UniProtKB/Swiss-Prot annotation:
Catalyzes the interconversion of 2-phosphoglycerate and 3-phosphoglycerate. Pathway: Carbohydrate degradation; glycolysis; pyruvate from D-glyceraldehyde 3-phosphate: step 3/5. This is 2,3-bisphosphoglycerate-independent phosphoglycerate mutase 1. The lineage of its organism: Archaea, Methanobacteriati, Methanobacteriota, Methanomada group, Methanobacteria. CDD domains: iPGM_like (cd16011). Belongs to the BPG-independent phosphoglycerate mutase family. A-PGAM subfamily.
Length: 409
């Protein structure tokens, strides 16, 4: 038997007046998701616990059975692992956005127009930076998918207790990065980062990629916004923890990084952009191939619904959910326990993550079937799983796969 957890990133939402009180998931035509719900057991899930606005990183860790409060040191190390950087003890890693700033250093687009190309050239320019007075700090910078990138600082006397530069909204300048614990290490790191942010604008505003984007009426990627500082955590390998050979199919560096740090085989998919324009057919083919291989467990993350939620794109979110549904019919099998869920809610009305629970459906051999006949936030709440937490998912899956040890006599 194989176990598959498919996470549609940010799929869950809230009822909207524009949809006559329905959520985007309820409004979408999802015959395959409905079939999964009808053939299995359903419920709603708090990725971490009720009311917690989970990040994609902490929610995935929780769903995989890791305690995010113990192993999560920040987003940066996972992003770095996801783009293939060998982060060493003492390194401090950050997730970065390519963003757009005007001549007054006001952020006008936090994602540089959802930039898709040219980022490798921009990254090489950042990677060549040195900061005067801090020549002992090596700057390692690499692009990830879309507007995402990774920064690693390597050198003596650095600390990870620093704040973020990202103002979280347009119309404001980058936040001044501050030491959070007052230590000399964190103060040094904060000073280096503030210089990097300022000097990134100076060296990127006339970069050929950006002059070309401006000529085409596109937002330039002329500044970087570091956030999510973290040192490399110790994470127990998934196969050691569960005795399951595992693979990860994901689009973003963040989730690939979780796969890498937990020891999964990470399968790259050409055309997987992490956006609503992603090549779902290629993703489907990669999933089918992985299911046919000798893996016991697959973690799958598809990201476009989250992007649409962050952009407030209601129609785009509905359409993307329908596109995902169209690839699911070919992925079911008689020897597969298939779990369909989201990692958090990203309501289009909020344009950010919220603490609302997400729907979850589990189907497979001898799964107890409840009376739910469609897959949505509202329908799943009436299911046999009732309300669970992300940390329950692996226990339930292992029990179904007959991989769970008995507790007690």
């Amino acid at each position: 038997m194989k176990g598959v957890i498919m996470i549609i990133d940010g799929m869950a939402d809230r009822p909207l007046e524009k949809l006559s009180g329905r959520t985007p998931l309820e409004a979408a035509s999802t015959p395959n998701m409905d079939r999964i719900a009808e053939s299995g057991i359903n419920g709603i899930m708090d990725p971490i616990k009720p009311g917690v606005r989970a990040g994609s990183d902490t929610s995935h860790l929780s769903i995989l059975g890791y305690d995010p409060y113990r192993v999560y040191t920040g987003r940066g190390p996972f992003e770095a692992a996801g783009v293939g950087l060998d982060v060493k003890p003492g390194d401090i890693a950050f997730r970065c956005n390519f963003a757009t700033a005007d001549e007054d250093m006001i952020i006008t687009d936090r994602r540089a127009g959802r930039i898709r190309s040219g980022t490798s050239s921009i990254a090489r320019t950042i990677n060549s930076m040195t900061i005067e007075g801090f020549e002992d700090v090596e700057i390692i910078f690499r692009e990830s998918t879309g507007h995402r990138a990774v920064l690693v600082l390597r050198g003596p006397g650095l600390g990870d207790k620093v704040s973020d530069a990202d103002p979280k909204v347009e119309g404001k300048p980058p936040k001044k990065i501050k030491a959070l614990d007052g230590s000399p290490e964190s103060r040094k790191t904060a000073e280096v980062l503030n210089r990097i942010v300022k000097e990134s604008y100076e060296i990127l505003r006339d970069h050929p990629v950006n002059t070309g984007r401006i000529e085409r009426g596109e937002a330039p990627a002329n500044i970087i916004l570091p956030r999510g500082a973290g040192a490399v955590p110790h994470v127990e390998k998934f196969q050691e923890r569960y005795d399951l050979k595992a693979a990860c199919i994901a689009e973003t560096g963040l989730i690939k990084g979780i796969g890498h740090l937990t020891g999964m085989d990470v399968i790259d998919v050409e055309g997987a952009t992490g956006g609503i324009d992603t090549d779902l057919e290629s993703i489907k083919n990669a999933i089918s191939s992985a299911i046919a291989a000798d893996y016991d467990f697959l973690l799958i993350n598809i990201d476009g619904a989250d992007e649409a939620g962050h952009d407030g794109d209601l129609e785009g979110k509905v359409r993307f959910i329908e596109r995902v549904d169209s690839i699911l019919g070919d992925l079911m099998g008689d020897d597969i326990y298939f779990i369909l869920t989201a990692d958090h809610s990203t309501p289009v009305s909020v344009m950010d993550h919220t603490g609302d629970p997400v729907p979850i459906a589990i189907t497979g051999p001898e799964v107890r079937v409840d009376d739910v006949t469609s897959f949505s936030e509202r329908a799943a709440a009436a299911g046999g799983l009732c309300r669970i937490r992300g940390s329950d998912v692996m226990d339930i899956l292992l029990d179904l796969m007959n991989k769970k040890e008995k507790f007690g006599a």
